[in-house]
Amino acid sequence: MMAPKSLQTGLLILLLAKLKLAWGMTLVPRQVTCDYEAAASSGDTCTSFAAEWGLTEETFASLNPSAACPSLVAGQNYCMVGTISAASTTSSSSSTTSSSTTSSSTTSSSTTSSSTTTSSFTTTTASETTSTAANGVTTPMPVQSGMIDSCSKFDLIKSGDTCASIASTYNIDLSSFYSWNPAVGSSCAYLDVGYYVCVDAVPSPVQSGITESCSKFDLVESGDTCASIVSTYNIPLSSFYAWNPAVGSSCAYLDLGYYVCVGTDSSTVATSTTSAGNGITTPTPDEPGMVSDCTKFWLVGSDDTCTSIASSEDITVADIEKWNPKVGSTCTDVWLGDYICVGV
């Protein structure tokens, strides 16, 4: 038997009321309190940007409900660390709320009855992972946005640290610190505890193949030669070539405006030695195999040849070959920047 039309209408109204209540309890609007924002770069997507900060795409979307995923707007700030809160709701019947958890979040839930307010929250934090930059140096996480890509040394911010104290500890100027870590602000107002900051960086540009262990650099200027650079920094020419292979074995490709390596963490400054045979101080770097009783030395320049050196010193090419056997029988292995013997 079909129910009376009035009863059908009443049941429909009751059903709609229950559905409305269910929707009201399920579609609770969320509020985001952002603690840290980062600017997206050209080409970033929700997936790639979230992964860069150690977040899932779902968590990123929750922190940025207005983001038009999958694309992001270059230069626009997006929330990376924050709190997601459900708006307050009330109900005359008992209700249960719960929240799911992700690998980088903490959650809480509550069960209430009668007329009450329920809420849930999710707090996200950047994952403590590492990444490898283009310079081969492993970058610890988390780091503040905008940090220089070529950073080679890092410091973990602790309570009580200031930009000035960090710069002093690492013997760097404050302007460099600010340029490497723009997110801290020009007055160090945003130095976030628990984040890594850059305290040393590889300058740019550098020639390809430069040693990854370089700790000291020199900007090649007009008039510079490999010999003049090694003389300035008192390092062996062979080390300079090893650290900067792109310049070539004869310094033919020393590019103006590029930085070259003039020291590594493990290198030591070349020092003069004294020959035991005659007590004459021998400058370095010197030609390997040079005679021990040499009394006069010549620093090989970029335009020098055995013939020109011999002419200047009023000796013969044969003398140079005899006193410096490593130059070869045709005197072709004279190393730029090395000292050779020109008198005994």
UniProtKB/Swiss-Prot annotation:
Expression is induced as follows: Highly expressed during the infection and development of decay of apple fruit.
Give the record's keywords alphabetically: Chitin-binding, Repeat, Signal, Virulence
- State where composition is biased (Low complexity): 88-134
Q: Where is this region: Disordered?
A: 88-141
Q: Is the ATP-binding keyword given for this protein?
A: no
Matches recorded under PROSITE patterns:
LYSM (PS51782)
GO MF terms held by the record: chitin binding
Signal peptide region: 1-24
Residue ranges of every copy of the LysM domain listed in the record: 36-80, 153-199, 216-262, 296-342
**Phenotypic effect of disruption:** Does not affect radial growth rate and colony morphology, nor lesion development on apples.
Domain comment (free text): The LysM (lysin motif) domains are small globular domains involved in binding chitin in eukaryotes. LysM2 contains 4 LysM domains.
Give the UniProt family note.
Belongs to the secreted LysM effector family.
User: What does the record's miscellaneous section state?
Assistant: In plants, chitin acts as a microbe-associated molecular pattern (MAMP) that is recognized by lysin motif (LysM)-containing plant cell surface-localized pattern recognition receptors (PRRs) that activate a plethora of downstream immune responses.
Q: What does this protein do?
A: Might have a role in sequestration of chitin oligosaccharides (breakdown products of fungal cell walls that are released during invasion and act as triggers of host immunity) to dampen host defense.
Q: Which PANTHER family match?
A: AM15, PEPTIDOGLYCAN-BINDING LYSIN DOMAIN
What name appears for this protein in its UniProt entry?
Secreted LysM effector LysM2
Could you tell me which species this protein originates from?
A: Penicillium expansum (Blue mold rot fungus)
Q: What is the lineage of its organism?
A: Eukaryota, Fungi, Dikarya, Ascomycota, Pezizomycotina
Q: Which gene encodes it?
A: LysM2
